[in-house]
């Protein structure tokens, strides 16, 4: 068996099937990895690895385009998006495409265009992936040195990191330009129940924006998830885009410092573990963001948050009973606390009953009824608008608590609709994926560190139990 430099620590298992899997430099004999180890076979074949990554991007973009068109084909304008199981159209609507006042969809053509553009892009990526996987050079170092690399080349690795950071920064600025110049984005806080608007007065104050990072993650603080106006969100993207681009330029122009060279493991598997760790953190943050935040993820498209649906129920019954003559300011509930209104731990007037635990909810249909000391009794008696009643009644029956068999809403709510909120799907999927990515991070980090330390030798084949067993054939 040829012993390559990369094979020093591999002791491949011989199986009955090895002879049939000669894949020209991608078989177990020459790489130390069996076919099921996926891209591990391509660790030293930069051209083939490029093909795998481009083809993977093609699959992702194809799914986005096809699913986008599937949702457009199934779209019913009479029902809210969140009642139709959509997970892509809400994102397009949040960007201001195809929607008008109150989040009403007035034109589905932009959604169709988005789907078609993604399908066309996926065809280009798919062709590129197949080309590089089957026809292109196996390694890029000789023919295209700019695109070639050696995993241990620290300077080249930080250059690649820098290019990635610049691309991420450009992505952040695309959102900024959309909000500033290209038609604006959907603002759930626009007066009268939300509308598309251009963001003109960006928040660029570092004390405000970086103050979010210093907040507690609990309760009414809510870390960065507590952001509740688009000026802060778009201004934050200006800062993030700038930091990413400047950091990218920095990493392209500089070499890693001595402390970084010593502290980090410099191998392909180590970079994989770093990436998985970062994606895991993104997944957990996205989970919290989509579950709690109704500014970046407007309730008109994603359905109400859990606290929002609960507060909407309290509001709906306050409106009903007030019309029937109840004195909502003083009525007592079964525990002796206020039935409709009570005071929070810090003295604000809040909704009473079980929803008291969600007293720090902020929602655009409720904020106009607050005064300096919480809910304003005179506004509750005189200023409630029909759109606020309609929206809270809708949200009350669409709590994001559905189970997988589509029994939506609160179990005791007889008016609930059979549906699973996209908020539930997006939060749950990002939590689960974030968890698995974290496990993958630990796994690959452990392997990479062991390999770097020189004790990843595998099982001693001389004493392997299988050698004393009867052959399968």
UniProtKB/Swiss-Prot annotation:
InterPro entries xref list: PS_antenna-like, PS_II_antenna-like_sf, PSII_PsbC, PSII_PsbC_sf
Name by which UniProt lists this protein: Photosystem II CP43 reaction center protein
Modified positions (N-acetylthreonine) in chain numbering: 15
Transmembrane parts of this sequence: 69-93, 134-155, 178-200, 255-275, 291-312, 447-471
Classification of source organism: Eukaryota, Viridiplantae, Streptophyta, Embryophyta, Tracheophyta
Cofactor stoichiometry and binding remark: Binds multiple chlorophylls and provides some of the ligands for the Ca-4Mn-5O cluster of the oxygen-evolving complex. It may also provide a ligand for a Cl- that is required for oxygen evolution. PSII binds additional chlorophylls, carotenoids and specific lipids.
HAMAP family xrefs: PSII_PsbC_CP43
Cross-referenced Gene3D superfamilies: photosystem ii from thermosynechococcus elongatus
Subcellular location: Plastid, Chloroplast thylakoid membrane
The protein's role, per its UniProt record: One of the components of the core complex of photosystem II (PSII). It binds chlorophyll and helps catalyze the primary light-induced photochemical processes of PSII. PSII is a light-driven water:plastoquinone oxidoreductase, using light energy to abstract electrons from H(2)O, generating O(2) and a proton gradient subsequently used for ATP formation.
Positions of modified residues (Phosphothreonine): 15
Ligand binding ([CaMn4O5] cluster): 367
Record GO terms (molecular function): chlorophyll binding; electron transporter, transferring electrons within the cyclic electron transport pathway of photosynthesis activity; metal ion binding
Domain of life according to the entry: Eukaryota
């Amino acid at each position: 068996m040829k012993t390559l430099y990369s094979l020093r620590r591999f002791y491949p298992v011989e199986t009955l099937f090895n002879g049939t899997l000669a894949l020209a430099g991608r078989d177990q004999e020459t790489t130390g990895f069996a076919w099921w180890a996926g891209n591990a076979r391509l660790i030293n074949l930069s051209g083939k690895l490029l093909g795998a990554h481009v083809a993977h991007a093609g699959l992702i973009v194809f799914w986005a385009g096809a699913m986008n068109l599937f949702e457009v084909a199934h779209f019913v304008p009479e029902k809210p998006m969140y009642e139709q199981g959509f997970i892509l159209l809400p994102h397009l609507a949040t960007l201001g495409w195809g929607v008008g006042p109150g989040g009403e969809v007035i034109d589905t053509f932009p959604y169709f265009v988005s789907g078609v553009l993604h399908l066309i892009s996926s065809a280009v990526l798919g062709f590129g992936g197949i080309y590089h996987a089957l026809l292109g050079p196996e390694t890029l170092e000789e023919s295209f040195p700019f695109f070639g690399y050696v995993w241990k080349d620290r300077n080249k690795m930080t250059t690649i990191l820098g290019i990635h950071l610049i691309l991420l920064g450009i992505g952040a600025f695309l959102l900024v330009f959309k909000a500033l110049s290209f038609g604006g984005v959907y603002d759930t806080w626009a007066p009268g129940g939300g509308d598309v608007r251009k963001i003109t007065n960006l928040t660029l104050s570092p004390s405000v924006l970086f103050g979010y990072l210093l907040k507690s993650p609990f309760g009414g603080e809510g870390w960065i998830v507590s952001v509740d106006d688009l000026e802060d969100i778009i201004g934050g993207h200006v800062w993030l885009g700038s930091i990413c681009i400047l950091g990218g330029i920095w990493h392209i122009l500089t070499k890693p410092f001595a402390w970084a060279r010593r502290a980090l493991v410099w191998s392909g598997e180590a970079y994989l573990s770093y990436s998985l760790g970062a994606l895991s953190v993104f997944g957990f943050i996205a989970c919290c963001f989509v579950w709690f935040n109704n500014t970046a993820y407007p309730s008109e498209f994603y359905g109400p948050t859990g606290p929002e649906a609960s507060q909407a129920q309290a509001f709906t019954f306050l409106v009903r009973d007030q019309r029937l003559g109840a004195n909502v300011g003083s009525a007592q509930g079964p525990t002796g606390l206020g039935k409709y209104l009570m005071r929070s731990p810090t003295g604000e007037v809040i909704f009473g009953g079980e929803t008291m635990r969600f007293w720090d909810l902020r929602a655009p249909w409720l904020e106009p009824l607050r005064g300096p000391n919480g809910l304003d009794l005179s506004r509750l008696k005189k200023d409630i608008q029909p759109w606020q009643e309609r929206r809270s009644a809708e949200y009350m029956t669409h709590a994001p608590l559905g189970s997988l068999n589509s029994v939506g809403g609160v179990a005791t709510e007889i008016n609930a609709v059979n549906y699973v909120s996209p908020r539930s799907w997006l939060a749950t999927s990002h939590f689960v994926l974030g968890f698995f990515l974290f496990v993958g991070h630990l796994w690959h980090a452990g392997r990479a560190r062991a390999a770097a330390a020189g004790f990843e030798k595998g099982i001693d084949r001389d004493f392997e139990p299988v050698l004393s067993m009867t052959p399968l054939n």
